[in-house]
Amino acid sequence: MNGILNVYKPIGITSFDVVCQIKKITGIKKIGHTGTLDPLACGVLPVCIGKGTKVVDYLMKDFKVYDATFKLGIITDTYDREGKELSISEVNVSLDEIECAVNSFLGDSFQVPPMYSALKVNGKRLYELAREGKSIEREARPITIYDINILHIDIPYVKFRVKCSKGTYIRSLCYDIGSNLKCGATMWDLERVQSGAFTKENSIELNKLTTDNINDYIISIDESLNQYDKAFVSSKCEKLLVNGVRIGDKRLLPNLDINKMYRIYSEDNKFLGLGMRNSKGLKIEKLLL
């Protein structure tokens, strides 16, 4: 059993809990997910099984889409409603001011991750330090907000949809919006509705998966990587590529763009893996036979 499951994680369990349940259903130990969702959050959680674990890093690079709600006028230590209240403020902002603050985060920026996060500093996770009562300076990291739109406002609650790059913390985004409005904000609800090619509409609820039906929902490895274009190679190229050879002879190569990742297939449509051509030739970057 090899491939990817587009699982819909319910509220109240960890992403690791999802992996454990899939292990019990399949009896397979080699399983991993492609991006943590906190227990408070629900939504799309692609789970890689067997050889599918080889593409975890590639799937994690994909954009994410979230529906999130924040509450104005409150700040907590975790930046979400499960944390300890640090401050409560009056909310005296207009709808236009809220819209302007939210839209100001569109594009490239730097974001400081929350203390309650799984990032490591000197070998220790930030949330472990936070639980010890320690707060350390965190380096701001580059993120991209590709799109952000307000869905509903019922002050003090604001619901919005955001399409963002890997590594974006929605809790921090809510906190930063609140800071911009000078009244504070805390994330109240979070749903991941898309992770790259994996959407909420095409997901399967965790409690509906069984030993009998799980195969019906497994997506093949090459299909899960459909953000990369297909490229076909001759049988001669196939043998060389599979053995780790970089092919520099242009007479043997398909017409491929330089420094662009492709899904490489044999003449008989067998998926070989991910490959890239540079100035020296074509080579398989990740063999997935």
From Swiss-Prot:
HAMAP family: TruB_bact
Role of this protein: Responsible for synthesis of pseudouridine from uracil-55 in the psi GC loop of transfer RNAs.
Active-site annotation: 38 (nucleophile)
Reaction(s) this enzyme catalyzes, per UniProt: uridine(55) in tRNA = pseudouridine(55) in tRNA
CDD domains: PseudoU_synth_EcTruB
A single MF term (Gene Ontology): tRNA pseudouridine(55) synthase activity
Main enzyme class: isomerase
Keyword hit for tRNA processing: yes
Name this protein carries in UniProt: tRNA pseudouridine synthase B
Keywords on record: Isomerase, tRNA processing
Keyword Isomerase appears in the UniProt entry: yes
Species per Swiss-Prot/TrEMBL record: Clostridium novyi (strain NT)
SUPFAM superfamilies referenced in this protein's UniProt entry, alphabetically: Pseudouridine synthase
Family annotation (Gene3D superfamilies): Pseudouridine synthase (3.30.2350.10)
EC number: 5.4.99.25
Biological processes annotated in GO: mRNA pseudouridine synthesis; tRNA pseudouridine synthesis
Family: Belongs to the pseudouridine synthase TruB family. Type 1 subfamily.
Domain of life: Bacteria
Pfam families found in the cross-reference section: TruB_C_2, TruB_N
